[in-house]
Amino acid sequence: MVRVWNYSKASPQTTILPALVRYPNFEARTQCEVLKINLDKSGKRATGVTYVDTSGNEWEQPADLVLLCAFQLFNVQLLLLSGIGKPYDPNTGEGVIGRNYSYQVTSSVDAFFDNKVFNPFIASGSIGMCIDEFNGDNFDHGPHGFVGGGYLGAVQTNGRPIQSTRTPKGTPRWGLGWKQAVAKNYLTSYQVVTHGGCCSYRDAYCDLDPTYTDRFGRKLMRITFDFHENELKMSQYLTDRLAEVAQKMGPRQFEKKPRTAPTTLRFTRRHIPAAARSWAPIPRAAR
């Protein structure tokens, strides 16, 4: 187990909570989940929260001040479930809660070598180098027909034997041929990446799912989103520049993987630029 004592990892469990637990008037109730924000009779002021513990018991915690400090999507879900603010309506453009959802635009180039060993298992989240010349307004967008941009990066974060295994195009999906390709390319392949911004659009938003519920019977969060022409053009341009870098590395083979649409994503990432307009007209005590 590695303990980080220099507070370089800016997460609540490593920076905020260790400082708060020293105070006698602070209590951390772990493994509990807030179900809703409670409001007064006027519906204009938060009075506390209702939460459930590991035994399934519901508790009400009164409060003069309620802070929404969960992950962004859970904050939006709590606002919608609690009846706080006006839900966004994509048909009229009215409402703020769930509005302005945007994502990230990533792409990659897989490069396969014969004479280079990368040892992907020697990695961390901060090992890498980036080219920032194609980010934001760092270059002339005029001839390209899109706004925005992103970085070109060589970032080695992990060497997981399944999820991070790369095989060249034409490799069988299973069997002896696949095993041979994995054995040949695991140490000698590398993926360079792009990571770009994404605009907010009227047809991209979060709302409550009309069909599916969680284990408490609450409506799940639903995300309606796809990439637009601007992001697709940007991804193609960045990926082409990235391929030029990869080609200079001298691989025997490389494959470009720009972002395409339509797409269906299983949400796994934590990079969400927006999911609710700031600030929404919510009760003062719930901010």
Question: Language model features by range: what are they?
Answer:
Residues 1, 161, 166-172, 176, ...:
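Patatin-like phospholipase A catalytic core
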Residues 1-34, 264-269:
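Conserved redox-cofactor binding core of oxidoreductases
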Residues 1-4, 62, 219-229:
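Glycine- and acidic
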Residues 17, 76-80, 239, 243-246:
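Non-transmembrane alpha-helical segments in soluble domains
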Residues 22-23, 32, 36-42, 49-123:
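Glycine-rich loop(s) and the adjacent beta-strand/alpha-helix scaffold that form part
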Residues 35-40, 187-198, 222-225, 229-287:
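A glycine-rich dinucleotide-binding beta-alpha-beta segment and adjacent secondary-structure elements
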Residues 44-50, 188-191:
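Short, hydrophobic/aromatic-rich segments at coil-to-beta transitions
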Residues 94-221, 229, 267-275, 281-285:
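FAD cofactor-binding and catalytic pocket of flavoenzymes
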